[in-house]
Amino acid sequence: MPRYKLIIEYDGAPYCGWQIQDNGPSVQGALETAVKAICGKFVRVNGAGRTDAGVHALAQVAHCDIAKEFAPGRLRDGLNAHLRPHPIGVLSAEIVPDDFEARFSAIKRHYVYRISNRRANLALQIGKVWRLPRRLDTDAMHAAAQRLVGKHDFTTFRDTECQAKSPDKTLDQLDVIRDGDNVSIITSARSFLHSQVRSMVGSLVWVGEGRWSADDLAAALAARRRTACGPVAPPDGLYLVKVDY
């Protein structure tokens, strides 16, 4: 039975997240419905990152085992046809070894959080960025962000319902870059805790607004207490960009 690796792009706004849940439609559910329409029976589609409600993906990775062998291009096109009108696109499909696991074979995940730092209302980016009208000091944000890079106990920056066994994670990158009114917060790690990226972004915004210093951010990390965290950024601006294997 061949195993297929899929690269998937999606707008997370209409979904309760990647994973199938009882409280609404999911990206995983839409994909599994499309696969069933092609092969005639249920097939589990496993993703590399279980993105939260409203979070987008530019290149989510998934794998599935399908009894019938399809040419990769034909499978891609068939899935895209059955996914309409969902805002989900299968960018590519390929046959991979049986031991490939989209989630557990991953060695690094890359995310970007996008902020529109302007006073004007959003017109073309509604639901795709976090609009903040107050000018952010992105140099201060970037400098403070480096205090979070490395291996730490990220209890402060994880959701209270996070099911990870350990709060320890190694953050490989956390950069804050400005391009005009557009601010990108770029981060990468082998894996992240539930709501970790959005929690770090919200706290960095407090630094950018002058409410916190870099030392305040470091103190919040050291507190290892969820209540020490700044605000949690909305999901609108968060994108899963790439997964490395």
Swiss-Prot record:
Catalysed transformations (reactions): uridine(38/39/40) in tRNA = pseudouridine(38/39/40) in tRNA
Gene Ontology biological process terms from the UniProt entry: tRNA pseudouridine synthesis
Domain of life: Bacteria
Keywords for the protein's UniProt record, in alphabetical order: Isomerase, tRNA processing
A Gene Ontology molecular function term of the record: RNA binding
Record-annotated active site: 52 (nucleophile)
Protein name (database record): tRNA pseudouridine synthase A
Gene designation: truA
